[in-house]
Amino acid sequence: MELEELGIREECGVFGCIAAGVWPTELDVPHVITLGLVGLQHRGQESAGIVTSDGESSQAFKVHKGMGLINHVFNADSLKKLYVSNLGIGHTRYSTSGISELQNCQPFVVETLHGKIAVAHNGELTNAVRLRRKLMRHGVGLSTSSDSELITQLLAFTPPLENDDTADWVARIKNLMNETPTSYSLLIMHKDIIYAVRDPYGNRPLCIGRLIPVGDINGKGKDNSETEGWVVSSESCSFLSIGAEYYREVLPGEIVKISRYDVQTLDVVPRPEGDPSAFCIFEYVYFARPDSIFEGQMVYSVRRRCGQQLAIEAPVEADLVSTVPESATPAALGYAQKCGLPYVEVLCKNRYVGRTFIQPNMRLRQLGVAKKFGVLSDNFKGKRVVIIDDSIVRGNTISPIIKLLRESGAKEVHIRVASPPIRFPCYMGINIPTKEELIANRPEFHDLANYIGADSVVYLSVEGLVSSVQESIKARKENENSLKTQKSRVGKIGHCTACLTGDYPVELEW
């Protein structure tokens, strides 16, 4: 909850679709992409865009972009611009490296020697400044402040040994991956192909789904053996609403070619020897939707395990467990289960108070929490309450909630946080306040309970978070018959905890 209030957000979601079989297809590709992006709306609310093609010509790209939410950017009229299409990619954005304006909207489209390419990017390059200078020294002009344009222009560069008559897109993609180690999950569209690419550290998520026939309302006539198309997405949560089933993840460093015929691995670019993968651990903590699947496990299950681990590390004498609706609910349920305490709702959320709500005066601004939440005082009056939250960033959001609960009759209010303190900015795709703004780096942190008005405050340890995330992964890998093959492809299990520990997976270049 606090993350949402304070602007700590994932900045992008990517989604692609390609129809299988005979073209022109009967599959409504633009509509599928739009619905896929709606499923990723939590990853970016500033702008959105879709690029489609009939696949017959590398020049026949149709583009529509706009500022705002998906349902504001795309309607019946704007979708008409994207027909007739057999494949396409889309993007929803929350800015980090580029300012929020239309020219930074993705996907980016550029003309190359071998036709147009469209690129959608989730992540943030750790060496963007150097790459920007390199391109400019080669006479390449840049029209936006987004580092995603750097990726597009680097792909347009002809790599060494490429014949002018044919484009070696795998060589171009590998050239890009050699130029920048992280952070990116990419969709690249050229003519009749979509390439799905994940950086060697696997910092940002990317997965593939298979579109299957919908059948009738009772499920009759549904043939799961038939493939109507392929989709690729930042999160698997976008698959159900479009009639797709989860197929698999794109592995760290993998270059996948998706065509109307099949899904094919073209190459896997390795990390430096000894380096573990570095999937962002905060995807599990907060950013992803709870029904998404990462590394073979559902996000909801991981959050619940975090709550159970928090109960082991930080038990407290109390009467009930609750949460601030609603991202920390799985952790709160896990905490309650482990402690043997009842889970009880103490707040109800006004869902119609959005991020863009205008605060006309100081009084209403100070009443922001009361405006957003209703109090279920009959559930906790005279009782000791444990509130589970996903994070405390600055401390000025949870404090009014504690005050509200006390004024409504809570005897005690204990705060338990289902993640460790955030101490460092991300620099790899998450918009986090400056180091000085984070409560964990300020003097108030040494007496945080008193500062926010709680009876006690305890965070989950870094070790506890990592073990909660990796427990299921390790157990599954131990049972896999193909363990040796799997290890050779993806290497050691690892997760990026840079915002918690300052230990970045690669050296940052500024």
From Swiss-Prot:
Highest taxon, organism lineage: Eukaryota
Cofactor needs: Mg(2+); [4Fe-4S] cluster
E.C. designation(s): 2.4.2.14
Catalytic reaction equation(s): 5-phospho-beta-D-ribosylamine + L-glutamate + diphosphate = 5-phospho-alpha-D-ribose 1-diphosphate + L-glutamine + H2O
Disulfide cysteine pairs (residue numbers): none
Transmembrane residue ranges: none
Family annotation (Gene3D superfamilies): 3.40.50.2020, Glutamine Phosphoribosylpyrophosphate, subunit 1, domain 1 (3.60.20.10)
Chain residues in the propeptide: 1-11
Annotated active site: C12
Binding site for [4Fe-4S] cluster: C280, C426, C496, C499
Annotated Mg(2+) binding sites: S327, D389, D390
Keyword vocabulary terms for this entry: 4Fe-4S, Allosteric enzyme, Glutamine amidotransferase, Glycosyltransferase, Iron, Iron-sulfur, Magnesium, Metal-binding, Purine biosynthesis, Transferase
Stretches assigned to the Glutamine amidotransferase type-2 domain: 12-261
GO cellular component: cytosol
The protein's role, per its UniProt record: Catalyzes the formation of phosphoribosylamine from phosphoribosylpyrophosphate (PRPP) and glutamine.
The name this protein goes by in its record: Amidophosphoribosyltransferase
Organism expressing this protein natively: Gallus gallus (Chicken)
